[in-house]
């Protein structure tokens, strides 16, 4: 699978306006987006599950369940709810991929609570049983399908609520959780081939532009501004000179910034 290695877009760093949404590359779009003429719209965001297609090359990913306790209390801010929901979708895959299927019931429960708080609870209920069944069977393929459907149905519900910004934050939260897991795994067991998977400056650039183009009521929140600053720093950390291979020190820097971003996303 080469989806991660052909990921995202723009190399320019600027402040995107609401009318200048960064373009999403086709390989990050869920297949369903191509089945209807009206599928691509302001609510369309990169699929968290697509990110994991290539990350499976980094086996095992790094996983620590300690942060799941933080999700027991729901944040009041809807933007933080969305970011955390994205990290939970990613957690579901990482838990099974690393042999921690016993954590999936907790993750599924948190997913349902967060989706309900965002107004998308009814759609998510139907996926909870599937997540548990696939996790118990350790069926990563079907689990990814259920997680993709979870993200897609939340996206649809938010479309009905006319709240596209939250869809973008869910996607960002998922990518950050995946990146932290992958970068920590590569840091512990470094090879150039594994490290190459991480160095996607265009991905960091896309998400920096994406959150910069959100409604000012969200994009100007202090923690969002800080996350955007960190994403620009991550883009710099991921930049490799032509013909150069990533080094262990560069992987450590990516892991460090990714950890800062995930910590912010989980607040």
Model-identified regions with their sequence ranges:
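Bacterial N-terminal signal peptides
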Residues: 2-14
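N-terminal Sec/ER secretory leader and immediately downstream segment
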Residues: 20-131
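Generic structural concept
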Residues: 86-89, 108, 112, 151, ...
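Secondary-structure edge/capping motif, primarily at the C-terminal ends of alpha-helices
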Residues: 92-99, 118, 122, 157-161, ...
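Short, charged, amphipathic alpha-helical segments
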Residues: 105-109, 129, 169-172, 194-201, ...
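Extended amphipathic alpha-helical interaction segments
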Residues: 134-220
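A cross-kingdom marker for long, charged
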Residues: 215-267
């Amino acid at each position: 699978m080469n989806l991660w290695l052909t990921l995202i877009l723009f190399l320019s760093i600027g402040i995107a306006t609401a009318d200048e949404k960064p373009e999403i590359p086709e390989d990050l779009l869920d297949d369903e987006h191509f089945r209807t003429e009206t599928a691509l719209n302001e609510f369309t965001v990169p699929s968290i599950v697509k990110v994991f297609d290539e990350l499976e090359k980094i086996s095992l990913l790094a996983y620590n369940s300690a942060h799941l306790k933080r999700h027991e209390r729901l944040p009041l801010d809807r933007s933080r709810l969305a970011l955390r929901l994205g990290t939970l979708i990613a957690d579901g895959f990482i838990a099974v991929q690393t042999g921690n299927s016993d954590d999936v019931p907790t993750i599924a429960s948190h997913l349902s609570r967060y989706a309900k708080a965002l107004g998308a609870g009814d759609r998510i209920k139907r996926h909870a049983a599937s997540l548990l069944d696939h996790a118990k069977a350790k069926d990563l393929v079907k689990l990814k399908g259920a997680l993709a459907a979870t993200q897609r149905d939340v996206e649809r519900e938010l479309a009905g609520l006319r709240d596209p910004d939250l869809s973008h934050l869910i996607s960002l939260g998922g990518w950050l959780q995946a990146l932290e897991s992958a970068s920590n795994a590569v840091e512990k067991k470094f090879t150039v081939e594994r490290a190459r998977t991480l160095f996607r400056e265009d991905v960091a650039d896309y998400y920096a532009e994406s959150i910069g183009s959100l409604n000012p009521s969200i994009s100007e929140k202090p923690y969002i501004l800080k996350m955007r600053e960190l994403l620009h720093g991550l883009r710099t950390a991921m930049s490799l000179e032509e013909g150069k291979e990533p080094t262990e020190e560069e992987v450590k820097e990516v892991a460090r910034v990714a950890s800062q971003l995930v910590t912010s996303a989980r607040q």
